Regions:
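Soluble N-terminal domains of membrane-associated systems
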Residues: 1-114
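N-terminal charge/polar-biased segments
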Residues: 1-26, 128-132, 261-279
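Alpha-helical transmembrane segments and their cytosolic membrane-interface
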Residues: 91-143, 149, 153, 253-261
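C-terminal ends of transmembrane helices
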Residues: 125-126, 169-182, 230-245
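Core alpha-helical transmembrane segments of integral membrane proteins
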Residues: 131-205, 213
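Generic detector of multi-pass transmembrane helix bundles and their immediately adjacent loops
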Residues: 200-279
């Protein structure tokens, strides 16, 4: 995560030596791993469990951590001094590859296969893992939209139209992601674009005499916007007893759903006012 997105407060008074220096290093490593998991979409229980396993593996029994959906608090008793760390971690995007890599690293650390100094280098490599290229993301969005339009009862014509919708949607999402637009605004604009392109495709296909279903095209197009990961992660957090984080994620999913509904509804309402346009 970029420096201007991180607000932290690490405190270890004085000049730690011996066991205190090691405790400080373990604290930083555990927080670094937890930060990587959380900002890439990891569940709360997974973040906390991973951090505790890393601390125990390096002999820090006095390690404690409290994790929320967008931040974590950790401390370790290094003997005469108490090290603490606070991180504000807004989630940028889900990256399952990084989550899997951190999980594999934590298991290797727990098995005693990774030295403390080497672990920092491994974490840096994980954080440097690239995201998918824009072209790949755009193609995946288009194909996914087409497949879901067909799965929800649409025809091959509907699937082809949904493919065009998906290919138009992902570039907008990438631009809004780079501009750091809010999640509500991004999904509102994305849903509006889906409805507009779907309506345009339906009118063009109708003019060509091809039968199509506008609702199936829209359904396929909005599937990439549906907050499935946030919803399932929230349920997992609640099942694990973390009701606060689970509720926050559930509220986040509801707000995204509202944004999608508002975006689609507004465009369809405007489209219905245009003479000659059938909604």
């Amino acid at each position: 995560m970029e420096a201007d997105c991180r607000k932290d407060a690490d405190t270890l008074p004085g000049s730690p030596a011996g066991g205190e220096a090691r405790a400080a290093q373990v604290l930083r490593l555990a927080v670094y791993a937890g930060e990587t998991l959380l900002e890439n979409g990891g569940e709360i229980f997974r973040v906390q469990d991973t951090m505790e396993r890393i601390a125990r593996a390096y002999g820090q029994a006095g390690f404690h951590v409290y994790v929320l959906t967008n931040g974590l608090f950790a401390c370790v008793d290094g003997g005469q001094q108490l090290g603490t760390s606070l991180r504000f971690i807004p989630q940028a995007a889900t990256h399952l590859g990084r989550i899997m890599a951190v999980n594999a690293l934590s298991r290797a650390i727990a098995a005693g296969e990774v030295e403390l100094e080497d672990a920092f280098g491994r974490i840096e490599q994980i954080r440097a893992m690239p995201s998918k290229r824009a072209a790949v993301r755009t193609l995946a969005c288009g194909v996914g939209s087409a497949c879901f339009a067909y799965l929800f009862g649409g025809s091959w014509v509907d699937a082809a139209a949904a493919l065009a919708v998906g290919l138009a949607l992902e570039p907008l999402r990438i631009v809004l992601e780079r501009a750091r637009a809010g999640k509500f605004v991004s999904n509102l604009l994305g849903a509006g674009l889906v409805a507009a392109v779907s309506l345009l495709c339906a009118q063009l296909l109708g003019a060509l005499g091809a039968a199509c279903s506008l609702d199936k095209i829209i359904i396929g197009g909005i599937i990439p916007l549906v907050p499935g990961i946030a919803l399932t992660t929230g349920i997992r957090d609640v099942a694990g007893g973390d009701y606060l984080s689970g509720t926050i994620r559930a509220i986040d999913a509801v707000l995204v759903a509202v944004a999608i509904a508002c975006g689609v509804g507004f465009v369809l309402k405007v489209g219905a006012l245009i003479p000659g346009v059938t909604v």
